[in-house]
Every structure is written in C-alpha cells, then in structure tokens.
Swiss-Prot record:
It comes from Streptococcus agalactiae serotype Ia (strain ATCC 27591 / A909 / CDC SS700). GO terms for cellular component: plasma membrane; proton-transporting ATP synthase complex. It is a peripheral membrane protein. InterPro entries: ATP_synth_OSCP/delta_N_sf, ATPase_OSCP/dsu. The gene is atpH. One of its GO terms (molecular function) is proton-transporting ATP synthase activity, rotational mechanism. This is ATP synthase subunit delta.
Amino acid sequence: MNKKTQALIEQYSKSLVEVAIEHKIVEKIQQEVAALIDIFETSELEGVLSSLAVSHDEKQHFVKTLQTSCSTYLVNFLEVIVQNEREALLYPILKSIDQELIKVNGQYPIQITTAVALSPEQKERLFDIAKTKLALPNGQLVEHIDPSIVGGFVVNANNKVIDASVRNQLHQFKMKLK
C-alpha cells in the first residue's frame, strides 16, 4: 500500500473516530465496526468492492446492505465513502477505525498463550498480572492454546510481550551454552 492510500485510510478513519468521541458513542461505533469487519472476514466482500469488473452501482448496493444495521453516523460515513468511490478501501478503513477506537478506549486485546487450557481463576490472575506489568488500564482477554510452548505462558498486548514459557527458557539456556 502506498503512502497516499495509507494517508487516505487514516484520514477517513480519523474522521469517524472524532465523530464517535464527540458524540460519546465510541463503544457503539466500535461494536458496529467490529461487526462489519466480521462480515468482510467471512465473505468475499473485500474482493468484490475492490474489483474493477464490478460496477459502481453494484458496489453501492453492497454497501447499502451493510448500512441496514448501522447507526446514523456510520450510515453517513459509509455514504461518503460510496460518494467518493472509495469502496475498495472500506475494509482497510474499518480496520484502521477499529485500531484507533481500541487506543481511545484503552481496550487492548491481552493475548495469553498457554500449553493447556486455564481455569477461570488462573485466567483472572494472569489477566491482572498482564495489566499491571504492561501498564494497561483495561483490556480484553484472548486465550490461545499452543502445546509447543511446553509450559508456562506468553502474554502479548499493545506490542509488548511477557514470555514465561518453558520453550523460551530452554532456548535461552541453549544460547548460554553456546
């Protein structure tokens, strides 16, 4: 993606985020944007909207169907995108909006990877440790199970990592022996 396109995506996303903040509907917009992203990720819609073989009217029709479950602000936002013929950028714009709203809310996904499933008490304890160590006011717990880490856990949030896995400890030990 070139710089001009990236700047365009950021400008569109910034405008909706500002409206959401101004009207105090950040969570509502975040939920709606997440639902739209889900639609894009479970369908071929991104390919259709970026295809040159599909007419502008057909693209407009697809975007109109997305608007049926959206708030007025998001409907207006989608209409502006269609009017400016930026349908091909809709998915990256939505992803950018989602990232910006996560920053605004401070609701970073806290990914915890373990070798086996955790009990609710263990999840809560690791979640609290992650929030404290990574200086996050709040977040969403996302659990992953990866037997290859052997034991321990890996916490990943806001581009920060706490790796207390047995695999990592063995790797560090191996490096010391060299």
